Every structure is written in C-alpha cells, then in structure tokens.
Amino acid sequence: MKKHYLLTIMALVLAIMPAWGAMYMVGNAPFGDWNPGNGVEMTDQGNGTYTFTTSISGTVWFVFADGQSSDWNIFNANYRYGPSSGGSQEVTVGNTYSTSKSNNNHSYKFTGTGKDYIFTFNLSSLTFSIAEYQEPQLPNPFDLPAGDVNGDGEINIADITMLVDIMLGGFANYDTRHRSDVNHDKEINITDVTVLVDYLLGGTLPQRVKEGYDYVWDDEAIPEVHLSVSLDEWNRLLSLYDANAYTTQYVMATATFVKDGETTVIDSVGLRLKGNTSRRRPEGGHGQMHQRDNTDWHHAHFGVNLRKYVDDDAHTIQGVRKIHLKWFKDDPAYVREVFCYELFKRAGVWTALRDNYCRLWIHVEGDSREAYYGVYELMEPIDKRYLKDRKDRFGASDGYLWKCRNAAAGLNNPGGDIWYDDDSDDRHTYTLETQTDEFDNARAQLIDFMNKLSNLSDSEFYTWIQEVTDVDLLLRTYAVNVAVGMWDDYWNNANNYYIYFNGKETSGYQFFFIPYDYDNTLGTSLRCGVQDDAGRHNPLQWGNDNNRLIARILKFSDFKAKYVLYLKELVEARNALMDRRSAQARIRAWQERIAPYIDNDTGEDTVIEDKPASWGNHSEYNLLETGSDNFFNAKAASINALP
C-alpha cells in the first residue's frame, strides 16, 4: 500500500550578495538532521511531515501538496502559497520537471524572486536540495537537415509518417515545413516522400543549390566582403563626410566576395556611407586624412553599388547589383535586425528584405594589410531590383516605390515634403525611388492615396482598403512589427518604411507596405510617440492614431480580430516563431556562429552581450534569460492579455 505524504516546504532559500548580486541557494540537507551550513532548519512534525525553515532570510513560505510517494504530480496537488510572516515575494509552483524516473527521486520547478528553481527530494535517502533551474535548450534549428521532418536528429520511417501527415493537412511550423521540402523545390508533395524512401533504401539526399539572391543571402554561410580603395578615393570619402555627414556620393573601389571557396572580384564599384542617426566617419576625426600607421578605424555603414561606374553583367554577384553593409550599432547582442527579418520570413511576410551575416575587410592602397572591420549585416537594398526579384508577388515591378522617413511620414500630410531621388544629399520625407521621370504622376497618386486614407467615411474606407491592398498581409506585417517592439515605425513615429504602388493610376493599383530598419528592437526601448515600453505596451494602442493606416483598419472588428490572432500565433510555442524558447535557440545558434569573428581592428563592439542599447529606457530587458525581464516573456504576456 502506497504511503501518503504531506510535505511542507518553507522556502525562500535565497540571499543576495550585494557586491555581485549572486544568489545563494540551499544545498543538500537531510530529513531529520539540521545542517547549519545550509542555513536551513528542519523540524519533524510527525506523521511523515517535515518543515524546512531558512535562516538566510526572514521571509518564510509554505507550499502544501498531497500525492503518492511514487508519483507526486504537482498538477493534481492540493497546493497554496503565502508567507508565514512578513515577506513580499511570491513563490509559484510551476510545471513539473523530472530529473529522474526513479520512484524515490522527484524534482519540481517553482518560481521565486524572478527566477526559476528546482526543489528535489529523495524518499529513500530522505534528502532534499534546491538549485537554480537550468532549462533544457532546444536544438539548433539550423543544424537539422532536410528530411529530418520531426527534428529528432535522425532520418527514418517516422519522418515519412510525419511528412505524409503534413501532406494530408497536419500541423507543421516553419522549421518542420522547411525540413519537409526534401528535394528543395519549395513545395511539399509526394516527390519528397519518394526521395525519403529512396534515401532509406540506400540512396542519397539532394543538396540545395543556391543561385542568384539565394547565393548571396545564404543563411548557412558567412561570406567575406573585401573592399579595396585607392588612397585618393578613401580620402575623398572622408572629405565628403566632413562636408556633409549625410552625403550620398560614391567613391570608386574594388569589391571581392568570397563564399564556399568561390571568389568573385569586381573592379570599379561604387562605395558610399549610409545610415541616419548612425552615420559615422569610418576613420579618424574631422579633417583628418588617412593615417597609414596607427590608423583610427571606426565602424560605419556602407553601401556598395557594383554597377555604379560600369553597367554590364560582369559587375554583379550572380545578378545582385547592390549590397548594404551595416554594423551592429547599439546592438551588443549582434542579433536584433537579423532576428526580425528572419521572423518576417517565418511569418509569411514576403515583402521583408533579405538579411544575413558577413565579414568585412577594407584595404586602403599602400597599407601593409587589410583592416578587419568584423561581423556586419549583409542587407538587400530596397530598390528596383528588389521589386523585380518579387515581380510575381507584386504583380508588376515598374510601379512607384517611395522611401518614407524623417519621423514625419504619417501618410496624413499631402502638403508635406514629397520629392524624388535626384542623387543629391537632401533627405525628403517621401522620396520617389523608381520611375523618377514620372514624378508628377507618382506624386498625384500618393496624394490621392493620403486623401482617401484620411477622408473616406468608415464604410467607404472598409471597401476601399480591401480593394487597394492585401489587408491580411498588412496585418501580418504589423503584427511582427509590434511583436518585436519596433517603436521607431510608421504607426508610432511616422518613420522607417517603404511603400509601393504597382500601378500608375489613382485607382486599380495595389499598395504594399514594406518594413524597414529593425535594429532598435527586442528590448531596445525609448520614450517616443505614445509609448515608453516597447515590451509591455498595449499592442492595440501601439501608435499615434493620426498616422491613420493601421488605426483605421483596426477600428473594424474583423480586421482587429485577425491582427490579434496573428500576434498570438507569433508567441504560441508550437509555431516556433517568437516564443521565448524557440527564439533563444535561433539567437544562440547565430551567436555561436559569429562569436569567433567578433574581435576586429576598430576595437569596437568586440564582445557579444545580452543587453539592449545603452541609451534605451528599459535596461532590464534581456534575450537569453528566463524571467519576467526577458523581452520575449514580457511581449508574450502583453499579447496574451489581449481579449
């Protein structure tokens, strides 16, 4: 006959060492014997009841539970919590966590003082211990090959079974679908099953062939980019910056792209500086020309136009004509923007640009060696080539593309600063980037769009917005935007986005919203617009409703319901999108890949750190811990609180 136990755990078994903020925890203490070194007093109450009291803290907690000695199931337990006397911290019984299948050894997880702990007791030796909980990490999703459909590290009949289930309508998240495309044709069908069966019978799995844009932005590689500049051209770049920090002028260079043992060398390319508030001089101080000895290199953003001076097929990298090179300014984690653009892709937002890691070197003519600038973002520019690459999705690639910025692009100011890209250094609120010879027509179309956005009645707006845009795609885009904590955006700050009209009339076109510039996210927060906490702010009240596009759409209950649904899908664990554990698995994988390459000749940003930008207003946010200050936990809480 099984014994019944009533365990009374008195437990705030922590003390904080002020100097280091370290946590002291109870070690092993035997039932029936007090070990003063642990700071815990045990009292035998009789009838199998034991009381443990910490002398480390004056706060005493009780957790009562009834159950079988062989299977103490915390979910079925009769438990309650609360301090015996004093105290203000709460300890919550959480999920069961078993460290042993032995009937005598049991482990349970609880939360206290913002951290998770494991309480373990052994019925045979009558001992217990408490230790900080170490959560099992999910496997690196990028290491699992196509064909390992269920992600268990093996390819066998179970993967075929799961693949067939997916084909019949079974659930599959992004990673599962990716691994289900065994033959890499971007479809999941009977051919993939055939390939898997052939493999299990002794065949081989096909290798993914990456060409064109997929070759340059290959998430399985970290390519090298080498830029070689003559001394005169480098000094001219420095002088251009001194004359106007926002210069868009190019100097001539040679670019070398190295990936998977293949080297592509392109001469006579255009090199320029990029960035907004992050613009920097790449060397020295104002007025200083290149110093050959003891060079003072600085991280900076660069744009490379491979066809700036010579317009032929030889001046591309497998058809790619431009690349942007962005340093990880204000992102000690080296991951925020890469994470966001990959999340857009996972969530089905195909308008997001491509982004990946690369390593950058710069050589100035006459220097004894290249300067290693470290790990950079390799970004796809949003331009006419971006449109052509997605022509089938956009429907047409010869429409009007606008860059919107300056914290004034609310799509509510038809009399605002509207101009075209004239190769000057001017920075307009709305800049036409394509078909600039049709500026008057493009401007008239944009103004008409603004007027309708602001002035149509609610019923007219409801019909019109569904005619001119894919509302579902727009809501998915904005769900990701808000989920990652993008406060410097259209809705809140009238900033940082592109729009595209695929037709040239004032009707009969499709309008597309293109997300852009996601480095100040994932816990890098700022008091801006209507908000001051990018993690906990209400997603339904994210921005200024005078920036009407999103605000007007969400006035309608069906659109609002979709938006909330897409937000909740992002944080639901099984979808492997932005729940904490799957997000952390991807972040750790990226950081492990780039860690050997972080140290660089600028001496800047040489350590990967789990913290937001130093100038933010919520320094408590982190990405890789598990408590309430973890950004993913905070964001999930704010989303799941929505009705």
Identify the residue ranges that each predicted region occupies.
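Bacterial N-terminal signal peptides that target proteins for export
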Residues: 1-9
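Bacterial N-terminal signal peptides
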Residues: 8-17
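Aromatic-rich carbohydrate-binding modules that target alpha-glucans
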Residues: 22-59, 67-91
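Structured interaction patches on ligand/partner-binding surfaces of diverse proteins
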Residues: 71-123
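Cellulosome-associated attachment modules in secreted, modular CAZymes
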Residues: 137-209
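Conserved NTP-binding catalytic cores of kinases and kinase-like/nucleotidyltransferase enzymes
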Residues: 209-339
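Middle-to-C-terminal accessory/interaction subdomains
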Residues: 214, 220-222, 233, 281, ...
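Internal "kinase-insert"/substrate-recognition segments embedded within catalytic cores
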Residues: 297, 301-313, 318-334, 347-353, ...
